[in-house]
Amino acid sequence: MSENEDLQKSFLDTVKYDEKGLVPAIVQDHETGKVLMMAWMNHESLLMTLEKKKACYWSRSRQKLWLKGESSGNMQDVHDILIDCDGDTILLKVSQKGGACHVGYHSCFYRKVKETLDMEICDTLMFNPDDVYGKKS
């Protein structure tokens, strides 16, 4: 496919969803390039993200749309949406308000593996999840 033919396809026609109708989305800070999280999107969440310019995902555990930051206030303003060469992974470049991770860190990738295979915290704790989501019994 030539570059011109590739660009004439609609973005929405290019996305290749898996058998469950989902596509992985990598989320990156638009200024620093830091990877913040990975989440799943379906067609509806992708449309909502395009419309609102706020990141919206599909929660596999809750089986419903999930507007990032709706309960915590840690919204993601979407600056750019990119799609990989195969059309089966999306990259969102966002401005993150607060922490991206539900356990309170700026990034979900807050643990670094050391040579000893132990892990160390390598990110900033932004909030206490018990204060934001309430304590789980």
Curated annotation (Swiss-Prot):
Positions of Mg(2+) binding: D84, D86, D88
Description of how the protein assembles with itself and partners: Homodimer.
Superkingdom of the source species: Bacteria
Cofactor: Mg(2+); Zn(2+)
Family named by the database record: Belongs to the PRA-CH family.
Pathway: Amino-acid biosynthesis; L-histidine biosynthesis; L-histidine from 5-phospho-alpha-D-ribose 1-diphosphate: step 3/9
Gene: hisI
Species assigned in the record: Chlorobium phaeobacteroides (strain DSM 266 / SMG 266 / 2430)
Listed EC numbers: 3.5.4.19
InterPro entries noted in UniProt: PRA-CH (IPR026660), PRib_AMP_CycHydrolase_dom (IPR002496), PRib_AMP_CycHydrolase_sf (IPR038019)
GO cellular component, one term: cytoplasm
Phylogenetic placement of the source organism: Bacteria, Pseudomonadati, Chlorobiota, Chlorobiia, Chlorobiales
GO molecular function, one term: phosphoribosyl-AMP cyclohydrolase activity
Principal subcellular localization: cytoplasm
Pfam families referenced in this protein's UniProt entry, alphabetically: PRA-CH
Name of the protein described by the UniProt record: Phosphoribosyl-AMP cyclohydrolase
